[in-house]
Amino acid sequence: MNGALDHSDQPDPDAIKTFVGQIPRSWSEKELKELFEPYGAVYQINVLRDRSQNPPQSKGCCFVTFYTRKAALEAQNALHNIKTLPGMHHPIQMKPADSEKSNAVEDRKLFIGMVSKKCNENDIRVMFSPFGQIEECRILRGPDGLSRGCAFVTFSTRAMAQNAIKAMHQSQTMEGCSSPIVVKFADTQKDKEQRRLQQQLAQQMQQLNTATWGNLTGLGGLTPQYLALLQQATSSSNLGAFSGIQQMAGMNALQLQNLATLAAAAAAAQTSATTTNANPLSTTTGALGALTSPVAASTANSTAGAAMNSLTSLGTLQGLAGATVGLNNINALAGMAALNGGLGATGLTNGTAGTMDALTQAYSGIQQYAAAALPTLYSQSLLQQQSAAGSQKEGPEGANLFIYHLPQEFGDQDILQMFMPFGNVISAKVFIDKQTNLSKCFGFVSYDNPVSAQAAIQAMNGFQIGMKRLKVQLKRSKNDSKPY
């Protein structure tokens, strides 16, 4: 038989040559034919053989061509990854041969939407046959057998399908339809995977949103004065400040990790699918946007400050989630810094200085990322807030914080960097002993609004650095006898 079973007549024009792996090396074409013929007439079987051996030995794989495409697809559905042949450890692998991939069905298959429910398959064929040979035409129907108003049409070549799209898409409005006819390439497996990832991301964000608002009930202990300020802050003009609280409440390391993984996958799929329309800004900020507060992400009119807070808060969130249980978990900060190019090989040690270095570099990495994504916005915000270091300017009532248990090494810039993500800092000061010129390990931070101060208290009070836990509370009013 010379390695093949041939017939005088030819297979259908759309017949598929299929590669089959995981077959016994002892099997001949005859045994393989008996395996495949239940699914349809076999045109040809070629067993791949090692010609370096005498006689040539089977490599345990072959090519099979059925007379019809339908038979090949039925065989693949019944055998691929399902049936294990005698003496084999793995199930049969059956897929179109590489030579078939250039003309894959998904490259020639069209989705037709907004089709009149009165149309049948013949009507669709008549409509699209002027553009080339149609291999398959199928109207989607419900369990009741009635048309769902859409169909699939597969042409012999991709060029035919493209011509049909150009001529027919939105060319007419069919009877009983509210919009013009839709003609586009049917979703590929890659498209379906991308959509699945996006749905997972949306679900994750919904869960996070629910958990976040649930945790905001912890603010119920605020005085009526602060509740009024919170209500005022939720107005459109102050939404950026309020989003800081939403970001700080209810997030944990697992949620952040899951969100980051899904967003990166979805962004990569989206970028590869639309390279011609890619925008450097949208591409860079897309993944970050998916991880920011749901409020900030869904508000088109968020202020420049809100956008900046969303970017810078990401680093703090990850750091807070991972670092609150002590030095051994400072790797969370290190990972965030490394992601953004901010961590050197010697950034971590077991001492307090190493902890400070990792923390500082994590913030530095976030700033570098933000600067690359939004250069103008970042530079403006940075200039405004850098001047706050060392200043003792006070904000409005309820916006001034007292922080103690600060590490000895912390200076004005360090405390500024730590509290910037929660809002617009107008002053940040670490108090120094004038005689020793060493830090007294406490300081003050003032915001331009009380909401940011409350967000900072929620996130930073009890935050552990080295062997110390920060204590963050509102600075007492000037009318009180003590500052704290």
UniProtKB/Swiss-Prot annotation:
The keyword RNA-binding applies. PANTHER family: RNA BINDING PROTEIN. GO terms for cellular component: cytoplasm; nucleus; ribonucleoprotein complex. GO terms for biological process: alternative mRNA splicing, via spliceosome; mRNA splice site recognition; regulation of alternative mRNA splicing, via spliceosome. Residues 188-240 are annotated as: Necessary for splicing activity. The keyword tRNA-binding does not apply. This is CUGBP Elav-like family member 2. Residues 1-89, 90-178 are annotated as: Necessary for nuclear export. Belongs to the CELF/BRUNOL family. It holds the Pfam family RRM_1. Keywords: Cytoplasm, mRNA processing, Nucleus, Repeat, Repressor, RNA-binding.
